[in-house]
């Protein structure tokens, strides 16, 4: 199992100092690495994230319908959003993975990264309380909550990027698969996204080409809005 690097540095990145670092260690431990892994914490964190985001949307949009609220919540808590949060925190550098997952690039796999975010939320809840979790999550989600709006459909990142570039009369993005790893039933795709306004390409990694393209597009959007 690969040793965790710098937990205090991760705490600073998360914006939370753990009283019990064992909880954070467990949250970063994949089931391939140890018996005491992060799946129970993930279960807890998933529920906490859902209630915090539901509450925030309910108060932010007093006239929104139940359907609109549900769609906005789904956009904010879905796997690719959590993967982007994990990548911003560089969680892949801190994960405990078994030899097989390490070899297959599990530290980049979107499902493992997304699950680790939920597990960390569960760990923070156990280390503190619901109100601390709420304030921290609202901080993590501040930009996304400020940008989201009710609508019939919550558009995906590729669509939003395409519409953004079309609005500026810019060329559309170019997506290229630059690497495929793993067995046929468990592959990891690395996709490169290039646009004229960015000097460097942006990389997305996921279990399918489509998901990798979405992750790359979402990262490009975040860079363009800075």
Swiss-Prot record:
Active site: 46, 118
Domain DRBM: 156-226
Biological process (GO), any one: RNA processing
Enzyme Commission number(s) of this protein: 3.1.26.3
EC top class, as a word: hydrolase
Gene Ontology molecular function, alphabetical: double-stranded RNA binding; metal ion binding; ribonuclease III activity; rRNA binding
Required cofactor(s): Mg(2+)
Reaction catalysed by this enzyme: Endonucleolytic cleavage to 5'-phosphomonoester
InterPro entries: dsRBD_dom, RNase_III, RNase_III_dom, RNase_III_sf
CDD domains documented for this protein: DSRM_RNAse_III_family, RIBOc
GO CC terms: cytosol
Major subcellular site: cytoplasm
Location of this chain's protein in the cell: Cytoplasm
Residue sites binding Mg(2+) per the record: 42, 115, 118
Keywords of the record: Cytoplasm, Endonuclease, Hydrolase, Magnesium, Metal-binding, mRNA processing, Nuclease, RNA-binding, rRNA processing, rRNA-binding, tRNA processing
Subunit field text: Homodimer.
Family, as annotated: Belongs to the ribonuclease III family.
Function noted in UniProt: Digests double-stranded RNA. Involved in the processing of primary rRNA transcript to yield the immediate precursors to the large and small rRNAs (23S and 16S). Processes some mRNAs, and tRNAs when they are encoded in the rRNA operon. Processes pre-crRNA and tracrRNA of type II CRISPR loci if present in the organism.
NCBIfam families in the cross-refs: RNaseIII
PANTHER family (alphabetical): RIBONUCLEASE 3, RIBONUCLEASE III
Protein name (record): Ribonuclease 3
């Amino acid at each position: 199992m690969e040793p965790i690097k710098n937990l205090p540095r991760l705490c600073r990145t998360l914006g939370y100092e753990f009283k019990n670092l064992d909880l954070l260690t467990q949250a970063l431990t994949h089931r391939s690495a140890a018996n005491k892994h992060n799946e129970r914490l993930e279960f807890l964190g998933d529920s906490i994230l859902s209630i915090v985001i539901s509450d925030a949307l309910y108060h932010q949009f007093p006239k929104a319908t139940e359907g609109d609220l549900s769609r906005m919540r789904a956009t904010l808590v879905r796997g690719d959003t959590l993967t982007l949060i994990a990548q911003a925190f560089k969680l892949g550098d801190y994960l405990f993975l078994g030899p097989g997952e390490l070899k297959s690039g599990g530290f980049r796999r979107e499902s493992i990264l997304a699950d680790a975010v939920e597990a960390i939320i569960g760990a923070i809840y156990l280390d503190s309380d619901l109100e601390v979790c709420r304030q921290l999550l609202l901080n993590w989600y501040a930009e996304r909550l400020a940008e989201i709006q009710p609508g019939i459909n919550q558009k995906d990142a590729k669509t939003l990027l395409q519409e953004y570039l079309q609005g500026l009369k810019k060329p559309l993005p170019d997506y290229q698969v630059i690497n495929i790893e793993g067995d046929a039933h468990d592959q990891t795709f690395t996709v490169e996204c290039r646009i004229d306004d960015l000097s460097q390409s942006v990389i997305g990694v996921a279990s399918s080409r489509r998901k990798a393209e979405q992750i790359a597009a979402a990262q490009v959007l975040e860079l363009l809005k800075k």
